[in-house]
């Protein structure tokens, strides 16, 4: 039994894929905490000058959500991101790092969403012009940590969903 973790840069279908795969496989889905937090507590964002305190609150909430959904226990949950995103976001924007963000959970497999799809901006996305650069940071971090992963390349959502489901089936996860 393994958890499946969707990870990658902004606007690569992670949340939609997590929900669709969870539905297709009848598995619980742990949503990304940041979007929920921002919608509730920071409804008129200025992401260019995003406060460190807000990031810290998001990081704590994400780790708490992971614990709630059994990230550190054996299981077959779907996670719409994990601490890798906190590590890259925190280091990039604040020079922040926390060992807790990279503490491995139970056996998991990462589906890294490549920025091959069209970019859709919204009030929370500010790094659209840096997607390739940030994608490489995910690849480097996954490699450095020795975490198992496959990159999802399909540029259209439906095709990426089929790609993810095919990989999950082939790997038996």
Give names to the regions the model predicted.
Residues 14:
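Conserved lysine of the Walker
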Residues 44-96:
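Conserved nucleotide-sensing/catalytic segment adjacent to the nucleotide-binding pocket
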Residues 10:
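The conserved Walker
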Residues 6:
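Hydrophobic anchor at the beta1->P-loop junction of P-loop NTPases
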Residues 19, 23-63:
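Conserved substrate/cofactor phosphate-moiety recognition/catalytic segment
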Residues 1-3:
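Pre-Walker A (Motif I) flank of P-loop NTPase domains
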Residues 94-161, 172:
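A glycine- and Lys/Arg-enriched "phosphate-lid" helix/loop adjacent to the NTP-binding pocket
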Residues 31, 79-81, 113:
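Active-site flanking residues adjacent to catalytic metal/cofactor-binding acidic residues
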